[in-house]
Amino acid sequence: MGWKTVMKQQKLVEKMTIEEKAALLSGKTVWQTREIDRLSIPSIFLSDGPHGIRKQAGAGDHLGLNASLNATCFPTAATIANSWDQDLGEEIGQALGEEAASMDVNILLGPGLNIKRSPLCGRNFEYFSEDPYLSGKMAASYIRGIQSKGVYACPKHLAVNSQELRRMAMDAVVDERTLREIYLTGFEIAVKEGHAKAIMSSYNQINGIYANEDKHLLTDILRKEWGFDGIVVTDWGGSNDHVKGVAAGSNLEMPSCGYDSAREVIAAVRNGKLKEADLDERVGELVDAVMELTSGKKLSDKNFDRNAHHQLARKAAAESMILLKNEKQILPLDTKKSIAVIGDFAFSPRYQGAGSSMVNPTKVEDMSSILQQYDLNILGMTRGYQRNGDVDENDRKFALNLSMNADIVIFCFGLDEISESEGLDRTHMRIPQDQIDLLQDISKVNENVIGILSAGSAIEMPWHTCCKAILHGYLNGQAGASATLDILTGKVNPSGRLAETYPISYEQTPAFRYYPSNEKTSEYRESVYVGYRYYDTSKVRVQYPFGFGLSYTEFTYSDLIIEEDGIKVSVTNTGDRDGAEVVQMYVGLPNAIVFRPEKELKGFAKVYLKAGESRQLRIPFDDKTFRYWNIKTGQWEIETGTYQIMVGASVADIRLTGMTERTGNSKGYPYNPAKMPYYYTGIVQKISDEEFRELLGHDIPNGRWSGNLEINDAICQMYYAKSRLARLIYRCLTKMKKKSEAQGKPDLNILFIYNMPFRGIAKMTGGAVSMEMVYGIVDAVNGHFMRGVKKVVGGYFRNRRNNKKYEKLLKEAGGKC
């Protein structure tokens, strides 16, 4: 089968008027598509839900400000990635699909698999990993599970969407090789192995072209190369030019923006800017999806098994937690020892991030409430600190006295809500200082401190010496408390392994000098050296390496056999406890002609072994094991050479090494090492303009803000506005943003508006504002107040009049037989 699938509902499309076709490609409401009753084409419902369904009971809004129905809050993607367990991912996907189907949700907007370029990205908790192979494999497992229940999964955000600051008005400047190898490979796996039936385009531009309008991305790569046969959905408010989006391969603009975009599509067809064949193809793809989703078998039971899903969330959390430190085997806990439990997080757990993925859970456990279910000698519990920074000296003193009298202290701490949220990037990697001050004081009176961390992304850990053991739960969902206690008491043997590197300090990170960008462009100068690819190659010492995690037992590796199509390796549990090991296969090419990381993850397997048990595992090679993208020939190629196959327990803990010869197919190597010395060493923190230009193969775009503001500039850029009123509005927005940050709770509405381009006013107001009116607003912002007001007022009445005309045409079409 070629890339272009046969339109299953062609006869329906042929019966549609052009007004119906154009209207169908934009949403009806915030979450629903339009129906065409006369042709029996129903509306379908889309919902957020990467780690739990967020279907709102009343009026819908993009950011979840209105209450949503109860759903299971599973651990976030960043947490589950640490399990390295594809079977678990599929199990969670099935549960998500069941819950979506029970709520009549047709398309689930997830999973998120953007690459963790920097630890500071505020939405990292929603993404799997810094590694594209692990991200893709875990995403594919979720997708298979979700879609097994008659619900489409919609992986997001395609592509290169790595910062929240001005995410809707940012141009990612990235070379084609890095785009392919780092930022697209995960999506490729999700499509080819997960068979995703929908995909969400990202807000940003990629090399000057909006992702939703990028034909190279949406047609040449997604559909032709990967064989994608589903629908492309915009991120909410992410449609810039709907006509260009339709031509490029985008099917559905969300949310509803009235009929403004539909009128643009019709005008483009009539003036020849858009081929009607392209319009028909997009409509056909969408109608195919709608009919498949509404005519297939779906769960009719409105009540999913809440208890079973809660227990699955517990299992998932336990398998995903990472034991980072365990001096003198202080864990599992000795039940005879007296224990003090301290920390705000023990009473009010932080189990998910903020933003569009926030779930209204069926129930939430906290450690303080369920401790009595475990055979532990609890001396006492107290908060000791307030996560909002308020100080209660009496409680602090009580915490220190309690610690002094206990044999062991369990200290629960981590990042607060304002630290990790959609629409907001972190400014540093530190845990709030009041928590660390208390930890340090406790460690002075009790050396047996067990730190229980809650954070959705990497953090700096200069305080790690204050803890004898550290158990990192990430954001572990509604059943995280019992999962944590299962590990602390030895009921479960920890088997989580880090899906991202923990650097010693933020200044060590590869994109330190380039992230986040405060200009129009974000330059990906670090190239392929993201995460461990950078630290490992440039020999930067880290706190905890990619793939790291401890167990209550020990594993040995032996008998590595390298075959033409994969490897075999034996793993033995040499300890006295049953446990699971994550066997990781890395591949490198010493003395490569084409610069590359020292090693890259190309396969993994999680194996459960009883004490003393040994098992031979097989990890296959695939089409991604040896390839690189040759920018000179525009294709995947293999460089001839002797490749190192490295098998170990982390990127820094290689147990067995072997070699394999590969005959390549390169038809000319793309780089001149003399012109790219730092890319050949991996030391990429200070890449010059000349070297970056050589990598790109063209001049570096000018990303400076200058001149008048335009419709695609972010509203926060009104700092530069010529209008005093616009600058006043900017100051008010900034003040409200800072106030919410000071209170410790992100104001999602303010954050969205702050980062939104002016065109978003038209895209996010349900048809009340047209693009003509937006141009008037921008005129006013640029100091042409009267001209702008005339456009806004005139545009308002024209928009109302034109919307009524359009609705009349649709009603007339509906009266036809």
Task: Describe each PLM feature range.
Residues 651-652, 658-729:
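Charged, amphipathic alpha-helical linkers/stalks
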